[in-house]
């Protein structure tokens, strides 16, 4: 009789392990959903350094050539990740517009309230970090579109509460959110 009890216990233990694995995979998947906003927030966190570098070197905030390069690169990367490249363009434009708005607002603030002793990071380093984050953002969006429910990745309250930067308005974040929801797979 003992072998039957042992077999029953093993069966129960096996079922518990399978159930645990299933719920663990759901928990991991849920953690991966809705993670685009923190990456966008981190990307925008570099704008003070960009503004400072440009102010220090008497460079304009508008850099159409750089903007075009960023947009074209993002569209090509998006396509390689299984995203519709055209659908990513409005999101990139919204992020660039928000980035420029942050830079303009910093420059305006510094006219009346300079920050003595603060030094921006070198622009080449900052752009490299921004480029890495842009890639991570696209990878995350592709992953979320493939594995997450729309409500998990497009939770407006979570998105808006996550993207918080000095000199970033709620209208800037709303524009990013609305274009984020337009991104599609191929």
From Swiss-Prot:
UniProt catalytic activity: chorismate = prephenate
Main location, first listed in the record: periplasm
Signal peptide: 1-30
A GO term for molecular function: chorismate mutase activity
Residue span(s) of domain Chorismate mutase: 31-107
Keyword terms: Disulfide bond, Isomerase, Periplasm, Signal
Assigned GO CC terms: periplasmic space
Compartments, as annotated in UniProt: Periplasm
Cited PROSITE patterns: CHORISMATE_MUT_2
UniProt record, GO biological process: chorismate metabolic process; salicylic acid biosynthetic process
Paired cysteines (S-S): 33-148
Enzyme nomenclature, EC number: 5.4.99.5
Pathway: Metabolic intermediate biosynthesis; prephenate biosynthesis; prephenate from chorismate: step 1/1
Residue positions binding substrate: 43, 54, 63, 99-103, 127
Function: Catalyzes the Claisen rearrangement of chorismate to prephenate. May play some role in the pathogenicity.
Self-association and partners: Homodimer.
Protein name, as recorded: Secreted chorismate mutase
């Amino acid at each position: 009789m003992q072998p039957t009890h042992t077999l029953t216990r093993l069966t129960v233990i096996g079922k518990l392990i399978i159930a645990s694995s299933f719920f663990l995979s759901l928990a991991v998947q849920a953690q991966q959903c809705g993670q685009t906003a923190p990456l966008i927030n981190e990307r925008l966190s570099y704008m003070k350094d960009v503004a400072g570098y440009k102010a220090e070197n008497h460079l304009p905030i508008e850099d159409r050539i750089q903007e075009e390069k960023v947009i074209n690169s993002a569209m090509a990367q998006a396509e390689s990740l299984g995203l519709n490249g055209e659908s990513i363009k409005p999101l990139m434009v919204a992020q660039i517009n928000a980035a420029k708005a942050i830079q303009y607002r910093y420059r305006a603030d510094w006219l009346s309230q300079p920050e003595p002793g603060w030094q921006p990071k070198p622009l080449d380093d900052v752009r490299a970090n921004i480029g890495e984050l842009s890639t991570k953002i696209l990878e995350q969006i592709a992953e979320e579109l493939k594995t997450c429910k729309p409500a998990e990745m497009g939770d407006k309250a979570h998105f808006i509460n996550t993207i918080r930067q000095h000199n970033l308005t709620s209208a800037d974040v709303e524009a990013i959110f609305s274009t984020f929801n337009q991104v599609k797979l191929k």
